[in-house]
Amino acid sequence: MNFKCVQFQSIFNILFILIISFPGGLIYLLTGSTLSFWLRESEFDKITIGLFGLVNFIYILKFLWGPLLEKISFSTLSNRGYKYCLVITLINCIVCVYVLTSFNPNTNFTPFVLCLIVLAFFSSIYDMLIQSSQMLLITDKNWGISEAACTTGFRIGILISGSGALYLSTIISWQDVYRTMAILCIPSLLLIIFYPLKFKDKMIANDFDKFFSAFYDFIKKPKWIVIISFMLLYRLQDSFLSIMPNMFYLDIGYTKQDLAIGYKAFGMCAAIFGGVIGGFLCRKYEYSYLLKRVLIYHALSSLSFIYLYFLNQDIISLYIAVFCQEFTKGLTMSPFFSYQLKCCSSRYCITQIALITSITNVGTILIGSISGYAATYLGWSYFFIVAGLCFIPAYILILYLPKTINSV
């Protein structure tokens, strides 16, 4: 990797972002894909499992407490305020995962769901802080690289709580699996506590009574409605697929062991590779060109599901299908998240990033919650055809995105 343009301190900051992103990915999957396997073994049907995606509706609302986080993080405590927010939030996430293991989803349904909601709440705050840290610690010319690092850390977390958790579930109970995942977050917590944070610019806390300042600043940007619409629809394909590939692979005969290695582990490596490639492509190509290309590649990857369904279901075909899907997914994410940072002003980075990612999560959560219905009533072949066509609205919007955005 070419780090000639990256200052020495920036390298450590990028590595810091990579490591603290790990718990974000690990916890995220514990309320999503990995949870679906636990629920499947607890004999919940596909429709109910799909509706569990609504637990993550809290991610849509996170922009509401963005101004409060900015007030706390950029207070007179300076960098320490931001660090305190990271530490307290991650501790609460770890505690919530442990508490979740006290409940059985069949016999303690209500407290189980409530605990998931609280976990999603703290996880959404942690997600906001991680993403804003890139604007605070990294120069804008290196956002593509820092986003690749963030994606890599996030994906490694997903790998552990996906493939690792799935494999462990064949040996120990799901409750013990979740306890193990919570323990794995502790090293990142220790790093946050002891790492010397130093913002590239001095940050000043915004007055909390000026709650709408961040939103007003955003709508002054050129074509802001197009930007918001694009954020909502860019991940429509992934939102529509949601956690249904898990059910698809099981339905066509693959075992949990096959999926732990072939889908979760290999797929995550492919996604990380795609994310790194996408991050460095951000330094070479302008955003509109790159976003269009990677969107098309990812749309074509839906053909791999249809290939598996109709033609071949051996282990090699699984690896090919998973690589096509996950590599292109990773390829789309680095330029997309880097573009999100480009759309934000540094003074309001936490609130505006929360706003943009909340908009993105509207599609991910609401569309994802009906994926079970779609898969049930369309059948797998038509379901994946529709998923492949989901790129069209975002592709059209890319043509109308503003050429330049003031992100100061």
Curated annotation (Swiss-Prot):
A Pfam family it matches: MFS_1
PANTHER family: MAJOR FACILITATOR SUPERFAMILY DOMAIN-CONTAINING PROTEIN 3 (PTHR12778:SF10), SOLUTE CARRIER FAMILY 33 ACETYL-COA TRANSPORTER -RELATED (PTHR12778)
Protein name per its UniProtKB record: Putative transporter AmpG 2
Keyword line: Cell inner membrane, Cell membrane, Membrane, Transmembrane, Transmembrane helix, Transport
Gene Ontology cellular component terms for the protein in this record: plasma membrane
Segments passing through the bilayer: 11-31, 49-69, 84-104, 110-130, 154-174, 177-197, 224-244, 261-281, 294-311, 315-337, 353-373, 382-402
Family membership noted in the UniProt record: Belongs to the major facilitator superfamily.
Localisation: Cell inner membrane
Biological source species: Rickettsia typhi (strain ATCC VR-144 / Wilmington)
Membrane topology: Multi-pass membrane protein
UniProt-recorded Gene Ontology molecular function terms: transmembrane transporter activity
Gene3D superfamilies the UniProt entry points to: MFS general substrate transporter like domains
SUPFAM superfamilies reported for this sequence: MFS general substrate transporter
